[in-house]
Amino acid sequence: MAGIMAEPATVESAPAAGTRAEKVVIVMPAYNAARTIEETFRAIPAGYYDEIVVVDDHSRDDTVERARALNLKAIRHPHNVGYGGNQKTCYMEALRDGAMIVVMLHPDGQYDPAIIPEMVRPIHEGRADMVLGSRMMVPGAAKRGGMPRWKRVANRFLTTTENLAMGRAFTECHTGYRAYSRRFLETVPFLRNSNGFVFDTEVIFQAVHFGLPVVEVPVASRYFADASSVGFRQGVVYGLGTLGTAARFLLHRWGILSSDKFRP
């Protein structure tokens, strides 16, 4: 089983804006994030990004107005397309803007923006095309961060199942904190993926299928009242979708049933 490289959580070694050639774009898939987007933005380390793009999935609040007041590029969907559909817009917009590295940061404050330099560093150094911010790398960190017990159990079960299917040893496949190289986004057919939460699962299986290196870095888990979160019912649907993705991956790999998600 292939090992996963753990990265130390030190931000000093990451390249700042003036020392790198790659354009770094932070994308924020937003939905009803008006109360948290400014605090999240203020916590992003200066000098480690070139542009921030907020894609609002037809929020009921004034997320777009808050983003524009912060001088952020903001795009509003005319109707709600879902979490995965939102990410598709995020990544296509980042590619159009010339991004070489794209960081997905939720605007609800659930993930610590201070880790962005560490999310970018493995791609900058040519060691990864996908970086996952794992809440499960440090024992007990998810519990200390307030992740509900049922989510911790489900996370471990699904990640173990996915690892068995992929032949990998990821500590977490269900983080929403991610970074991608331009090569990744131009190689993986992510536009064919789900518009729902299972999008995040599909891109990991695609990374493995297309042989793109993945690195994990430890991140803190932060659950609080204003943080968006998948409820139990949505979690069941997501879990079934994850198992379905694993099955499609194996059927495609074994040559039994082809899937367009794993074709160039």
Short names for language-model regions:
Residues I75-R96, I101, P113-F197, F224-R233, ...:
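Acceptor/aglycone-binding surface of glycosyltransferases and processive sugar-polymer synthases
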Residues Y31-A46:
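Short, well-formed alpha-helical segments that are part of the catalytic scaffolds
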Residues A33-T36, S59, D112:
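Donor nucleotide-sugar binding loop of glycosyltransferases
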Residues D56-V64:
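A conserved acidic beta->alpha catalytic loop
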Residues V25-P29, V53, R76:
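Short hydrophobic beta-strand elements that form part
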Residues Y48, L70-N71, F210:
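Short, structured coil segments at secondary-structure junctions
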